[in-house]
Structures are given as structure tokens and as C-alpha cells.
């Protein structure tokens, strides 16, 4: 007796298990992981989304909640499991998992605890998707990108930190607000370490090719009567303010990560400020990861743009590199 499905649907091609073309995995289904997931789904970037976490109930609930939105999405398969076999054949894996900083905890201690988490996660990712590109989002992102690179054994063009992509987006938004234009028409770069010691490249800030520093030579300095330096200060403080107000940040970082993924999956060769291995650049001698303008395409992070930086900007980058190395050199089990 034929089933309803057999009566309804007459097959033309043989059924086969298909390997997904553009599978994306998100590791960690906390606020940031789920913001990444919904941003990826909203841009229709993937034909299969896999979620992984250690909290099974939360994981299943998030998966079901997204699956129930399938009618409104163009992603035919959404899966989740605590077992990493669910991530097999991923093109891109986004790592948002990690432990949170406790009150009064040193960064070194926080990093070491996250190293212990990553020692489990990273080998599993590489086991099931040996050809993937890994995007690290967990903080402190520059150090954990280095940790991921070391643990994964992947070439450096396939291990990328979300880095200053969000810092630069915040910078362009705040500048554009002051000027009354859209952020996409206000060009500016935040480089270096994601967060407190990031570097604003004032010499490169422009609108329609007009250098703003040529109009106001004091821009970004302490002598500036218009106090544009405050914009960079606001970029650095904005995450803390959002955390103070709502407890965490998630939407902007989720959108920022989807933006990076789009450049890679669509082979766009767009340029983003993301965290990459900078040894040998700007006189940096250690294996540290910092954000520089990088070309992202289907192969991963394929090139770095040589920006003309001023001496004090290079000095700031070197200082960040030294700070990061100071923590990295004491990490155990890498």
C-alpha cells in the first residue's frame, strides 16, 4: 500500500545523502552564538547550520526554536548536538564558547581556563572538518585566536579572529552619526588589539576620499578643539556600557561575524580589520595575532594590506603585541 508521500511525490532522481555546499557551525549557543546564528540565517548564507554546546537542553531548545522559523528562512537544514560529528564537512566554524571572566580574575587566569576549554573543542572541530576556516569570537579574542591556531595545526590563513571588525563598525557608526551620513560612507579603521588598547588610524579616516585629518590636522590628538578623540574612547567604552545596561553584547557582534562569513562564502575578497598572525610586520617579533586590514575570500584570509601608519600608531601596535605576548608566553599545554 503506497503511503501518502509516495502518492504525492514521484521521484525523478535517486535519493542520496548530499554533502552540504556551505555548511556553517556555531560552537556555543549563548547570547553571542545565537546572535551569530540568526545573523547567518537572516543573510541566507548557508544550506546547513549546525549548533554545538555542552548544555543539551538549551542546545535542543535553540535548535527547535530556529527550526520553527524555517518557513521564513532559506536554510533547509538546522541541526544540533553536543557530539561534534554533527559539525562534519563545515566550510566555516564560528567559536563563541568559553568561560566568562569572574570578578577580580586576572586575564592570564581567564585565558588559561579558556585554553583548557579550547583544548577539547578545537581538535574536535578539525577532526570532522579538516578543511574548514575557523573564526574565533570568544574573548580575549586575539589570544584565543593564537591558541586556536596552535591547537588546530591549521595554516594561519584559515584561523581568523573577529578582532576589530566590530570596533571599526562602531567607530564608523559614531563618526557617521556626528556627520549625519550612513556608516558605509564614512571610512575609518580601528586596528591592533580588540578592546582597550585598540588603535584608531586617524590619518586614514575619510568621506568620499576627503581626508578628515587634512580638514582638521589636530583630529584625534589632545589639542583638537572638536575632541574627535572622544569617538575612539566611546568605541572602547561602548561594550562596557552595553554590558552594564543589558548584561552582555550580542547583536552587533553577530552581525559583524555574518559580514565576515559573507565575504568568504561568496568569495568577495572584501577587506576587513580582523585578527591575524602579525609576526614580521611593523617590527613585531613574536607570534601574536592582531587586527590589520585583511582580504577575505573563499580560501580564508589571503592577504594583508600594508597601511601607512604613523610612528605613534606603530608604537601602539608594538605595545599591544608585547602585552599579548606577555600573557601568551606563560600559557601552559599549548
Swiss-Prot record:
InterPro entries: L-lactate/malate_DH, L-lactate_DH, L-lactate_DH_AS, Lactate/malate_DH_C, Lactate/malate_DH_N, Lactate_DH/Glyco_Ohase_4_C, NAD(P)-bd_dom_sf
Residues the record lists as N-acetylalanine modifications: 2
Key words, A-Z: Acetylation, Cytoplasm, Membrane, Mitochondrion, Mitochondrion inner membrane, NAD, Oxidoreductase, Phosphoprotein
Positions where Phosphotyrosine occurs in the chain: 240
Annotated pathway: Fermentation; pyruvate fermentation to lactate; (S)-lactate from pyruvate: step 1/1
The keyword Acetylation belongs to this UniProt entry's keyword annotation: yes
E.C. no: 1.1.1.27
Entry GO CC: mitochondrial inner membrane; mitochondrion
Keyword Cytoplasm listed: yes
Compartment(s): Cytoplasm; Mitochondrion inner membrane
Annotated family: Belongs to the LDH/MDH superfamily. LDH family.
Name of this protein: L-lactate dehydrogenase B chain
Annotated organism of origin: Bos taurus (Bovine)
Gene that produces this protein: LDHB
